[in-house]
């Protein structure tokens, strides 16, 4: 392999590949409904409305909140242990707990990314007049007041959020920001803790873990709606009304049109369970000789509830379960579906659960790595601590 020219060795010649031209959120996404803020809304809908996805996210949050938090000193010397204790004290001196922050950081799994603004403080003790400097500690070191969540749906597409060549994060712009108007809602990258599920193409918005479940979710939602409609029609039926043709024609008089409108309203109210009875005229339809025509058609005005004859025996439940399995499988959480059928074994259950826990381990390790890189390192620089003594979460 040839040695690169010294004039080029330090240059970043190529580009990451992420579409940053218009500052759009996920500009490279193939599906229009998952691009930009529409995508944020759709993933939020999936997270909040689907029972299977809700169970997956709840299980993930509860498992990861219970993971012990350990600050590892660089060695066993008193100095190194002292610096590790400082980091522990920082995490314990925020307005919220670290568990609460992790719970919020896990929103990056749903949306692909999560931003938190770091609010720093001088640790001046619990009795200091300026509340912004309140702390359990009075050592004067820099600490952290809070890691303030910046909700995904408040992030505005912005051409100045990323470096157009490298794709590196420069900052984020919030809608209706309460920041200083001079900043115009822009929060620079050095004030942020930035979580994302993947760094492919250096896309700052990552990739939602629900992306591969989107198709199954769409079909599942449609089938559940169809199932509910089918059950309703089977139980309640569809009201059918009959009245003389002259009431329905274009040449109907105003009185006939008024009667027709009242009749249509009656049918609609019966369908919506807003009306408990229907009062109809008892007049019969007569032939040319003035005699009743007989049968159901003998009534001049009539209402009938039509129900299914049960001839279409399509069991929709297995189809719904298949899509629920697909959603769980897409995030290795298929163990949640165990017991929904007669098949399966303990060995299979343990294998699926172990796979899920392994994936959870990678998520929590990623969160701790980002905290070490984007929170502890800046604190180290602010306090002027020796870099070689910096511990890791």
Annotate each language-model stretch with its function.
Residues 314-393:
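C-terminal helix-loop subdomains that flank or include functional centers
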Residues 1-65:
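N-terminal-proximal low-complexity accessory segments that begin disordered
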Residues 195-326, 330-334, 338-339:
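Extended, charged amphipathic alpha-helical segments
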Residues 102-105, 117-120, 232-234, 238, ...:
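Short coil/turn segments at secondary-structure boundaries
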Residues 1-18, 22, 265-298, 381-393:
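C-terminal anchoring/interaction modules
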Residues 155, 172, 294-306, 343-348:
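Conserved catalytic-core motifs characterized by acidic clusters
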Residues 41-214:
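Structured, mid-chain assembly/scaffold modules that mediate subunit interfaces
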Residues 78-86, 90, 94-97, 101, ...:
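Short amphipathic alpha-helical segments
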């Amino acid at each position: 392999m040839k040695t690169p020219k010294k004039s080029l060795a330090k240059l970043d010649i190529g580009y990451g590949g992420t579409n940053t031209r218009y500052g759009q959120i996920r500009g490279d996404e193939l599906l229009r409904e998952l691009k930009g803020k529409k995508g944020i809304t759709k993933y939020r809908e999936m997270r909040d409305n689907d029972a299977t996805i809700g169970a997956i996210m709840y299980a993930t949050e509860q498992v990861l909140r219970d993971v012990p938090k350990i600050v590892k000193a660089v060695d066993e010397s008193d100095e190194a242990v002292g610096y590790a204790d400082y980091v522990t004290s920082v995490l314990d001196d925020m307005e919220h707990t670290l568990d609460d922050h992790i719970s919020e950081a896990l929103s990056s799994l749903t949306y692909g990314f999560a931003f938190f603004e770091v609010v720093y403080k001088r640790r001046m003790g619990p009795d200091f007049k300026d509340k912004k400097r309140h702390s359990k500690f009075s050592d004067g070191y820099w600490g952290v007041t809070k890691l303030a969540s910046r909700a995904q749906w408040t992030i505005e597409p912005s051409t100045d959020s990323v470096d157009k060549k490298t794709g590196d994060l420069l900052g984020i712009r919030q809608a209706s920001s309460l920041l200083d108007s001079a900043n115009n809602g822009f929060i620079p990258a050095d004030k942020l803790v930035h979580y994302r599920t993947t760094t492919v193409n250096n896309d700052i918005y990552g990739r939602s873990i629900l992306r591969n479940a989107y198709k199954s979710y769409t079909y599942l939602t449609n089938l559940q709606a169809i199932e509910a409609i089918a059950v309703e029609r089977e139980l309640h039926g569809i009201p059918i009304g009959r009245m003389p043709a002259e009431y329905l024609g274009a040449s109907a008089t105003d009185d006939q049109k008024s009667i027709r409108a009242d009749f249509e309203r009656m049918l609609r109210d019966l369908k919506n369970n807003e009306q408990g009875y229907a009062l109809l005229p008892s007049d019969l339809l007569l032939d040319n000789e003035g005699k009743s025509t007989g049968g159901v058609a003998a009534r001049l005005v009539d209402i009938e509830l039509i129900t299914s004859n049960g001839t279409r025996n399509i069991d929709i439940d297995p189809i719904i379960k298949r899509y629920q399995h697909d959603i769980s499988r897409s995030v290795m959480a298929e163990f949640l579906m165990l017991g929904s059928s007669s098949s399966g074994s303990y060995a299979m259950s343990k294998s699926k659960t172990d796979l899920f826990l392994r994936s959870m381990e990678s998520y929590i390790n990623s969160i701790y790595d980002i905290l070490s890189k984007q929170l502890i390192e800046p604190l180290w620089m602010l306090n002027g601590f020796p870099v070689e003594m910096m511990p890791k979460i």
